[in-house]
Amino acid sequence: MGFCLALTWTFLVGSWTSMGAQKPISWEVQRFDGWYNNLMEHKWGSKGSRLQRLVPASYADGVYQPLGEPHLPNPRDLSNAAMRGPAGQASLRNRTVLGVFFGYHVLSDLVSVETPGCPAEFLNIRIPPGDPVFDPNGRGDVVLPFQRSRWDPESGQSPSNPRDLTNAVTGWLDGSAIYGSSHSWSDALRSFSGGQLASGPDPAFPRNAQPPLLMWSAPDPASGQRGPGGLYAFGAERGNRDPFLQALGLLWFRYHNLCAQRLARQHPHWGDEELFQHARKRVIATYQNIALYEWLPSFLQQAPVKYAGYNPFLDPSISPEFLVASEQFFSTMVPPGIYMRNASCHFQEVINRNSSISRALRVCNSYWSRKHPNLRRAEDVDALLLGMASQIAEREDHVVVEDVLDFWPGSLKFSRTDHVAGCLQRGRDLGLPSYTKARAALGLPPITRWQDINPALSQNNHTVLEATAALYNQDLSQLELLPGGLLESHGDPGPLFSAIVLNQFVRLRDGDRYWFENTRNGLFSEEEIAEIRNTSLRDVLVAVTNMNPSTLQPNVFFWHMGDPCPQPRQLSTQGLPACAPSTMQDYFEGSGFGFGVTIGTLCCFPLVSLLSAWIVARLRKKNFKKLQGQDRKSVMSEKLVGGMEALEWQGHKEPCRPVLVHLQPGQICVVDGRLSVLRTIQLRPPQQVNLILSGNRGRRALLLKIPKEYDLVLLFNLEEERQVLVENLRGALKESGLKFQEWELREQELMRTAVTRQQRSHLLETFFRHLFSQVLDIDQADAGTLPLDSSQKVQEALTCELSRAEFAESLGLKPQDMFVESMFSLADKDGNGYLSFREFLDILVVFMKGSPEEKSRLMFRMYDFDGNGLISKDEFIRMLRSFIEISNNCLSKAQLTEVVESMFRESGFQDKEELTWEDFHFMLRDHDSELRFTQLCVRGVEVPEVIKDLCRRASYISQEKICPSPRVSARCPHSNTEVEWTPQRLQCPVDTDPPQEIRRRFGKKVTSFQPLLFTEAQREKFQRSRRHQTLQQFKRFIENYRRHIGCVAVFYAITGGLFLERAYYYAFGAHHMGITDTTRVGIILSRGTAASISFMFSYILLTMCRNLITFLRETFLNRYVPFDAAVDFHRLIASTAIVLTVLHSAGHVVNVYLFSISPLSVLSCLFPGLFHNDGSEFPQKYYWWFFQTVPGLTGVMLLLVLAIMYVFASHHFRRHSFRGFWLTHHLYILLYVLLIIHGSFGLIQLPRFHIFFLVPALIYVGDKLVSLSRKKVEISVVKAELLPSGVTHLQFQRPQGFEYKSGQWVQIACLALGTTEYHPFTLTSAPHEDTLSLHIRAAGPWTTRLREIYSPPTGDGCAKYPKLYLDGPFGEGHQEWHKFEVSVLVGGGIGVTPFASILKDLVFKSSVSCQVFCKKIYFIWVTRTQRQFEWLADIIREVEENDCQDLVSVHIYITQLAEKFDLRTTMLYICERHFQKVLNRSLFTGLRSITHFGRPPFEPFFKSLQEVHPQVRKIGVFSCGPPGMTKNVEKACQLINRQDRTHFSHHYENF
C-alpha cells in the first residue's frame, strides 16, 4: 500500500513538469533581493527595507532612546518571574516539534534583525546579584551584553520620524532562506550545472560555508568551537544555528535538486539557468503553500481569508510586532530535547559530546554545533526530521524551558544568554508599544485588570501574574507587548499574537505580485496552482527521504492518537545531559606577553639605532685614526715588553683594569694593554716597603704599600703567577737597597687596609685646604678636617708629601714639563723626590704674598740651572721655551733667539751674555703689575671675583695702570657693596684709556679721548630692579627674534588648529562612526597628531629648498620671514614631528589594545571595509594590527626609519659620521613613500595626507631639479694646497653666472670619492675674486681622504686633480653683517671659515671706495691653539695689510692656556707683550692682532662697545662655532639687552 502511495506522489510531482512549464523562461523572474515586486513602491519587501509598524513607536525620547530601568523592569527579573517553569508539559493541541522549527524557518525567510547596527549601541542586561546561572558567586557586576540592531539611517531624526529597524532579508515568502537574499548569494549556492544547488562530497549535503558566502558562524557555546568549518551553505545566514534548522534547510536543498533532476530528465535540451529557474519557481510555490495553508492554520488554529487576488496598494512589509510575537511564541514550544527515529518507528539513542548516550539531542548543547556526530549522513538527517514529526512540542503557554531561557547562545564575550530577556530588550530597541496600546490599535477589547489577561492562568497559577504585576508596579499600562502576549496564551496564541501574525501573513500573500496563486503573473496555470495546493510538507518529506508515506501522519504539524510512531514519552530535562555552563571569553588571553614584547621592541628602535650609530661612529673614528696614522701604539722602550700580567684593583666601587707590571732599575712601571704608562713608582732608599699577600680565596692578591704613595693592589689568576712577581720584587727591592716587610692577611682585610687612589685624592684635598688656609687666612672650619678614622691615617695626613706626578697634576701640567722640573727641584730642599707640607708652604707664601722682587728672585733661581747666580742667554732661551710649551707652540730656535736678543736690547743688555738677578728684575720693570697678580695656579683654588673681573677687562680695550693710592675701593658690578683691596691686589679702572690699546697695534696716533669703560650712569642703569632687567631682556629678545617668533607662532598655530580640529571631530562629531565609544583617548590622540604630522612632514620640505630660500631672502619677504633660520626651523619641525609621532604611536597602541579586546560586531562597524560581522565575535590579535595591515606595517617601518634618521641626524653623530648622516637622511624618500601608503589606506578616515603634501612636494622637486642641473657640472680644481693643521686649500673654477655673497656656503662632491656624497663648506673667497676657494680641515674620514687625494700631483697642471661637483650658493645669517654700522664677528674652531670671506670682502670694498654701511668690525677668533688655523692667520695678515681705513679690529684668544695669573702664564704674557711692543707682532701668530690667553668674557667686551660707540643704537653680533661658545655669546647679549641702551642683535650658527 505504501509503495503505491509513493508511486502516486511521484506521478503527481512529475506530471506538472510535463504538463506545465514546457517552455524555457517566459515569465518575469523574481529578483533575489525582493526589489521591484511592487511596481509602484519598488523598495517594499526588499532586503534592507524598513520594518513597518502596526502601532506608533514608543521611545523614551520619542525618537530612538529605548525605555528601560527604572521605568521598566529588569529583563532578567521579568523572565525569571513570568517565563520560568518546569519542562515536560505537552502541547495542548498536540503540535509537533517539526511545526515549531518550521515556524523558525519561515521566520528566517521573512525577517532578520539580529545583525547589530552601526555605530555599536548597547542595551546591556544587568544580572541581579546571586543569579544561579550567570552570577553564582554573587559578584553583582555581571552584565549580559546586548547590541542594538541595525536601523535605517534616515530614521530616528525626530518624533515624527522615529528610529525604524531594517530587515536584513527580503520581506516576502520567496524562499530567501533557501536561495539567499541577493543574486551573489544565490550564485554562491549554485553549482551552475543541471540547475542544481552546489553540494559537497555527499550529494545530500550542500557545500561547506566558505567565501564569498558570509554565513553566520557563531562559536559553539557548549564546546567553544569556532570558524566556518562544519557549517553548511544555506540561503539563510543563520541557517546553522542548531541541527533542527539545519535539517529543514537540508530538506529544501534536497527538494530543489530533486526537482531540477526530474526537469533535466524531462527536458534534456534545457540549460542550467532554465532548469534552475523552473525548479526554484516550483519550490517557492510549494513553500508558500505549505507555510500559509498548512503551517499557519496549525499555528493559529484559524485559516486566512480566501485569496482574492493581488493588491498592489497593500504594504506587505514585516512589522516589528510580528517579529517579536512569532519568535517569542515559538520559544515557549521548544522542548529541552529532540528525538530521532527511523522509518520503522525506532527512536534512536544519540551520542553526546562526551561520548555518552542519551535518548534525545539536548537542545542547549546543540547550538552552532559543527560536524555533529549524530548528523553525518543523509539517513541521520532523515531520522531527525522523522523524530521532530513524531515528537509533541512543549505547551503553548508562558513557560520557556531552561535551554532557551538560560542557555541560549550568547553574544560577545558570554557563551550563554537569556533569550527571553534578549527578546525583551529587542522589543525595547524596536520601540514596541505597551500591551494595552497594541490591543487597542488592533481593535481588541481593552484589558483593565491583570486577571483579565488570562483568566485560566489567574486561576491555576496566579503567582505568575502577581509577580509580573509587582515588577510593573501594578501599572497595567506599562506592561510590554511581549510578556503581555505570552501571558494571555494558553494552548494557542492569545488574541493579540494571533491578530498580529494573521495580519502579517495576509498582507504578505495579498501584496506579493509573485504569489503562486496570482494567475496574472504568468508563473503557473490553474492546473499547476491546484497541484501546488495539494502538496503538503509530508509530500516533500516523502519525496526527499524516499520513505514509505505511511510512516508519517497526514499533517506533520500535528500528532494525534492513531498516527504512526508515537513518541516514547514527553521529554523533560530529566534523563538528558546537563547544559554546558556559561563561560566568558577573554579576547586578550595569551596576548599580554607578546603585546608587551612588541611595544618594548618598538621602544627599542631608538636604542638599536643609537647602538648602530655608536658602532658606526666608532668604526669611522677608528678608520679616521688609521688615516691620520694615530692608531699606532705608544712608543715604549724595549724593556717594557714582556711584563707580568695582572688585574689592578682600584677600589670597592671601581672596576678592575688589566695591567702589565715591569720591574726596572730603581722603579716599578705599570702600563696598560697599549703599553701606555699608567703609573711609575720610584724605589729610593731609605723607604720602608710593605708587601702584603692574601692568604685565602686562592691566594691571588698582592698589596704593595709604599710611603707617600697610594697602594698598588694586584690580582692574579693563579698563586703561581703571583709568586713569580713576588720573587722578582724581592730581588728588585734588595738591589735598590730598600727595606721591606712581608706578611699575610685575609683578602677582605687586605683590601680594607689598602689606600686607594680616591682615598689619596681626598687626603691631598685636605692637604691643600690646610695649606692655603695658612697662606690666605681661611678659617680652619672652612678648610676641612683631617680624617680621624685611625691614628695611623691622621699621622699620614700630617706627614703627607707630594710626588712629582701629584705636584704636576695639581698644576694641570705634565710631569716631564721643564717648568715642573724647575719648580719641583727648587721646592724640594731635602732632595728626597717629594714635597713636604713645609716645603710647599714656603714657596706658596712667595707666590701668594711675596713682592714682585721676591717673585722675580724665585723665578731667577728656578732657571739658574747651573746655580752660579747668573742666567745666560741659553738659560733664558730654555726658560722662554718652557713657557711656550704650555701653548703647544713650536717656535724655531732662530725666532726664540730673536725674541731674547730684542728683550736684551730693549733693556740695554745687548752686550751682556749673562744676567744677574738685578739685571733680570730690571728687564721686568714694565710688568710689575703682572708680577703682582702672579700666583701659583692650583686646581680648586679660585681667584677673588673682583680681581678676575678686572683682569678680564685688562685683556680687552683698556690698558691698565696701577692705582697710585695706597688703598682704593672697588664696587662689584652685581651688588652695591664695596670691597677694599690693597694696591698689590688691584688695578685701577679709573685711569683707563681704552682706545690706545686698539689703535696702537696699527701704529696710529690716538686723536681723541674715548669714553671710560664703566661710567656712573652705566652703573645706575645696571642696578635697576630685577623685574626691569627681565622685562628689558624679554623686550630685546622679542625685538631680536620677532620674525622667528611670528613664523613659529603661525606655523604652530596651524599645527595646533589641525590637531584641535581632528580631536574635536572625533571627540564630539564622529558619533555616527562609533569609534570614540570604543577608543576615545586613543583615537583623539592618534587622529589629532596625524593631522599635525601630515602638515609638518609636508611643509618641512620647504625648509630644505635651498635655492628657493636663497632667492626669497633677497626679496621683501625677508623682512617678515627669517629665511636664514631655515635649518634651525627644519630641526625644530623635525623634533616636534618626532614628539608628535611618538604620541601618535602611543595613541595607536591604545587603539590596538582596545581593538584587540573589542568584539567583531563592533569592529565591523568601525571598519566595514575590513571586517564582516559573521558572528564569530573574536577579534584579530594585536600582531594582526601591527604586522598584517598596511597602516600597521608601514607604521612600524616608519618608526624604524624615523629612529634611524633622527639618531644619525643628531649633532653628536653628525659630527662623528657625516657620511652616516648623509646616507641615513636620504631615507627621507622611503619615509615619504611609507607616509603616502600609510595615510592612503583609509582605515579610519579618507586619505588626507595628499592635501598637505602635494604643493610642498612639487616645490621641493622643482628646487631639487634646479640643484641637479647645477651639481652635475664638473668643476676643475685650479690649485690645491696642503696647509698645516690638516687644512686643505682648494681653489677651483668659478662657474659662469655663479654669483654669491660673502659668508655664503656651497656643497661639493669629489668625483674621486663618489658623486652622491655632498658636504657643505663655507666659501673663503671674496665675491670679487675670479676663482672660488675653500679651506677644508681634515676633521673626518671624508675630509681626510680629500686631503690625500689632493696631494701634490706627480705631473704639472691642474688636470691631475680630480674634479668637483658644486651646488650652491646658499645663504646664512652672516650675510647680514653689512646691515649694521658696527658688527662683531665671533668665530670658534671651524666656525671661523664664514668670516674669512667677509673680512676679505669688507677690505676690498673699502679699498675701492665702495659705499659700505658697516663702519667697524670687531673680529674675535677663539682657538685652542693658533696652530689649528694657520691659514686663517694668513688671511688676517692680508686683511691687516690692506686695511688702510682701520675697519677691522682683530682679537685672538688661545684657550689652551690657563686662565689664571699663575707664574708660567704671567711670564708668557710678559714675553708676548714684549715681543708685540718691539716688533708690533704677536709672538704666537706673527700678526699685529692682540693675542689673549684664555676665553673671551663677552659681557664686559659688549659693555665696552657701548662706551666706544655710544651713537650706535644697534650692533650686530654674528657667532659661528661650537654650541657652548654661541650660547655664551647669546647669554651675554641677553644680559646686555636688559639695559635700555645699545641693542645687540645676535645671529649664530653651530658647527
Swiss-Prot record:
Positions that bind Ca(2+) 1: D828, D830, N832, Y834, E839
Enzyme class: oxidoreductase
Tissue: Expressed in thyrocytes (at protein level). Specifically expressed in thyroid.
Task of the protein: Generates hydrogen peroxide which is required for the activity of thyroid peroxidase/TPO and lactoperoxidase/LPO. Plays a role in thyroid hormones synthesis and lactoperoxidase-mediated antimicrobial defense at the surface of mucosa. May have its own peroxidase activity through its N-terminal peroxidase-like domain.
Subunit structure, interactors included: Interacts with TPO and CYBA. Interacts with TXNDC11.
Family: In the N-terminal section; belongs to the peroxidase family.
Name of protein: Dual oxidase 1
Native source organism of the sequence: Canis lupus familiaris (Dog)
